[in-house]
Amino acid sequence: MSSQTPVVTVDGPSGAGKGTLCMLLSKKLGFQLLDSGAIYRVLALAAIHHGVDTESEDALVPLATHLDVQFVAEGDLVKVILEGEDVSKELRKEETGMAASKVAALPRVREALLRRQRAFEAAPGLVADGRDMGTVVFPNAKAKIFLDASAEERAHRRLKQLQDKGLDVRFDDLLSEIQERDDRDRNRPVAPLCPAEDALVLDSTSMSIDEVVEKALQYIESKLAE
């Protein structure tokens, strides 16, 4: 990985606001964007499009190595472009999610996707959104942020999102799901969720998105000036 290209990593638990922060940072800095959480779904979708068996490492590794994908911040959304086509909606389909879990279980595919993610590092810079960006994927990144929020706050945010879509959900159920996922992510044997030693930890529980962006930008600008 080139030390010349500035890389900003944003890690943290589900629902902390990483996606929104990364999208806004990408726009403000003019940097490219990587949504690592979507990369397995993108590969699964590419496999479906090309008729590739989602359980065959031999077939998936070359597809992962040459995966033609871009993440584009547009308006309030991040568009996912696979082989020139906007596949943002397709990525959310249950079929894609099920195929993604099969793909993610294959060690050589994970290794190929790790290399593919690192290939996003290119001028003028990169904002990388994930759970192990600063610890595993880009350990030499110039600026590392760990964005956190209490489980209760993340459950409230998720509740509002789902209610805005007209869905009937219970706060207690969402909170349990978030706590279970946190426990899995923080205690998994490979690349557990934790801040890099040199990361700025931002707790967004009682901060607006504007405040989070302002603090993140101040930190990034100071790190890039070093």
Swiss-Prot record:
Q: Which domain of life is it from?
A: Bacteria
Question: Family per UniProt?
Answer: Belongs to the cytidylate kinase family. Type 1 subfamily.
The answer to whether the entry has keyword DNA damage is no
Q: Which GO terms describe its molecular function?
A: ATP binding; CMP kinase activity; dCMP kinase activity
Cell location: Cytoplasm
Alphabetically ordered keywords of this record: ATP-binding, Cytoplasm, Kinase, Nucleotide-binding, Transferase
Q: Which NCBIfam families match?
A: cmk
Q: Which gene specifies this protein's sequence?
A: cmk
Task: Give the species this sequence originates from.
Answer: Vibrio vulnificus (strain YJ016)
Q: Which Gene3D superfamilies match?
A: P-loop containing nucleotide triphosphate hydrolases (3.40.50.300)
InterPro entries registered for this protein in UniProt: Cytidylate_kin (IPR003136), Cytidylate_kinase_dom (IPR011994), P-loop_NTPase (IPR027417)
Q: Report the protein name in the record.
A: Cytidylate kinase
Q: Which GO terms describe its biological process?
A: nucleobase-containing small molecule interconversion; pyrimidine nucleotide metabolic process
